[in-house]
Every structure is written in structure tokens, then in C-alpha cells.
Amino acid sequence: MPTSEQNEFSHGSVGVVYTQSIRFESLTLEGGETITPLEIAYETYGTLNEKKDNAILVCHALSGDAHAAGFHEGDKRPGWWDYYIGPGKSFDTNRYFIISSNVIGGCKGSSGPLTINGKNGKPFQSTFPFVSIGDMVNAQEKLISHFGIHKLFAVAGGSMGGMQALQWSVAYPDRLKNCIVMASSSEHSAQQIAFNEVGRQAILSDPNWNQGLYTQENRPSKGLALARMMGHITYLSDEMMREKFGRKPPKGNIQSTDFAVGSYLIYQGESFVDRFDANSYIYVTKALDHFSLGTGKELTKVLAKVRCRFLVVAYTSDWLYPPYQSEEIVKSLEVNAVPVSFVELNNPAGRHDSFLLPSEQQDSILRDFLSSTDEGVFL
């Protein structure tokens, strides 16, 4: 039976769902190394039609997983995009077959640093090979082909998920009809790389790091918590932090900080340690930093090969992935006469991960784009 909290969030829910796993023989990475075997954790919602042309792949951000919608048994909270996935929602499961998978290099069921090395019976940890955004997409392509799907109706994602969607459009241009890129970029700027580098250095400087070969009993928890705290600062806008925290003191008897914002960041860091792996954090942030489709003329040249319609969404308050990066993508698409709809949502008190949050305006934008099947239709 759903809990009262589940009922609160479950209007139009896909209900109780289960993460599945599939094993492929191998995946050759862009760097030349091979993952053998390749494991992919995934969830699906809705039904694949006979023509197999109603499938939508949704791609998660840095700390996400395959659980995009519905509830796992005993969960109080639904999947990370539950507001937008389900019967009658933007990604309507009465109409579409939604696929969500955990990226390789992550720590939520797909091949990554926590995978057991068959040669010694221990987790690969820091000996796992480097994984790129392109490798993540190539792994997803194996999953899509497993379902017998030749052409996806859409690929959608925000932040790192948006990078995956972009990579799909250039790596497999004939295999998707629509591409939705939210709060993302064609490559990281020096500032974005700098934020991630600080997080990685926090992990590397933890006394328990041990060259990435730590035990579960002695993980680099302090370093990972600091990395998450740094990340959360970049997710929030200045106005949101002023409205939510200001200079308020922390609630309760907290000795380690004098301000509410400090208490919030400490909580985010400590809770993150319980659900994420430090090696995966390093692998995934490096994949983000090394992803590059270029900018300007270089990006225009790369995007000349795409064959799908685009929806690009940016957020005025997002200073981690500022709107100018989305505008660069749009300009390059327009030069190539690619049908593209661009929306910049102006919510001063918003945040980078606004694409994950419930929003009637955002729901309408996604719904209208997906339902407008004629090429060249603009919002």
C-alpha cells in the first residue's frame, strides 16, 4: 500500500517500479579500453508500441540514477523526474515508452568503480577505466538496440543529461527524432571545470582516500561531503539563498556552523555520502569536464550532422550553466537550419537544477514540444 507521503506525490504516478539490469558482452570505450562484461541498470515506464517508434530516453544528471519515476517499495519519495513522467504528464506513459538508465561510471547499478573485478574478486575502484560522455551514450545505444528500437522519439535531459542528449544527436543522428537539452552546455568553461576540480581535490586530500582503493568502512566521506557542499553552492542562485537563508542562525544546537546556510550545506554533504561513491564522483565529474563539442564555428560544424528537432531550455538564475551556453547551442543549430525552439525561464529565485523541480510552465513547454510533431514548429 502507498504511504501517505507517496499519495501526496503520486497523482498520475506510474506506481511501484523496479530497477532492472541487463548484461552485454562488452563495450569498447573511446579511450581504447574495454568493459567486460557491461552491466546497465535501467527502468521503463509505459508500453513500447508495435512500430517501436514511441520510445523516449531520459538521461540523468551527475548524482542521478535509473529511478526517474514512480516509487520503489518502501520509498517515501518518487523518482527524480516523477512530476513529468506518468499517465497524462509531459512524458505521457499512455503514449510514450520511457527508458531511464544509470550511466556507466556511476554507482547505481551500471558498470563503474563499484563493479567487481573478476580477476581478483574486488571492486575496480580507481582502477576502472576512464569513461566519457560518449561512452555513456554508446552504452545507452546498446540498451536501446536491445529493445529493437531503431529511432527514438526523443532523448531528453538536464545538466549532464543534456550533454548526453547532445551527444546522441551527433553520434547517432539518424536514431532520434527530437532532442531536449535543459540547463546544459556543449562544453565546460574554465569556471565549471574549476568548481569540479575543487570537489575532486577535496576527495583526494581526504586521509581515507588511499589512492582510490579505500574500504567501505573507511571511505573518504569528509572529502566527498565537502565536494557535494561545493556543488550545492553552484546549484543555488544568490537570490534564492538570500530568500531561503539570509543571515539566519541554524536551527537546533549545531556547534559546527553559525548560519542556516552552513547547516543546509552540511546536511547536503552528509546525506550525499550515504548514497554516492567518491570514485564515481571523480569519474563522472571528469567525464563532464572532458566533454566538448566545441563552441562557435567548431560547434556549428559538429552540429551540421544532426537530423532532429531541438528544444533548448535555459534558466536566467543559473550561474553554473548560464544561458549564454544554451544560446551558443541554439545559434549553431540555427546556422545549420536545424528546427530549434529556445526558452529561457526567468525565475530570479530559481536554481541550476530547476529542470528537476515541479513547474507548470516547464510542464507546458515540454508537453507542447513533444506534441508538436511537424518539423519546424516553434514554441
Curated annotation (Swiss-Prot):
Record GO terms (molecular function): homoserine O-acetyltransferase activity
SS bonds (residue pairs): none
Keyword field contains Membrane: no
Pathway this chain belongs to: Amino-acid biosynthesis; L-methionine biosynthesis via de novo pathway; O-acetyl-L-homoserine from L-homoserine: step 1/1
Entries under Pfam families matching the protein: Abhydrolase_1
Cell compartment(s), UniProt: Cytoplasm
Domain AB hydrolase-1: 54-332
Catalytic reaction(s) noted: L-homoserine + acetyl-CoA = O-acetyl-L-homoserine + CoA
Class of the enzyme per the UniProt entry, highest EC level: transferase
UniProt-listed Enzyme Commission number(s): 2.3.1.31
UniProt superkingdom: Bacteria
Gene Ontology cellular-component annotations: cytoplasm
Biological processes per GO annotation: homoserine metabolic process; methionine biosynthetic process
Residue positions binding substrate: R228, D353
Keyword Acyltransferase annotated: yes
Keywords assigned by UniProt, alphabetized: Acyltransferase, Amino-acid biosynthesis, Cytoplasm, Methionine biosynthesis, Transferase
Gene3D superfamilies: 1.10.1740.110, alpha/beta hydrolase
Active site: S159 (nucleophile), D318, H352
Family to which the UniProt record says this protein belongs: Belongs to the AB hydrolase superfamily. MetX family.
Subunit-level organization: Homodimer.
Biological function: Transfers an acetyl group from acetyl-CoA to L-homoserine, forming acetyl-L-homoserine.
Official protein name in the record: Homoserine O-acetyltransferase
Gene: metXA
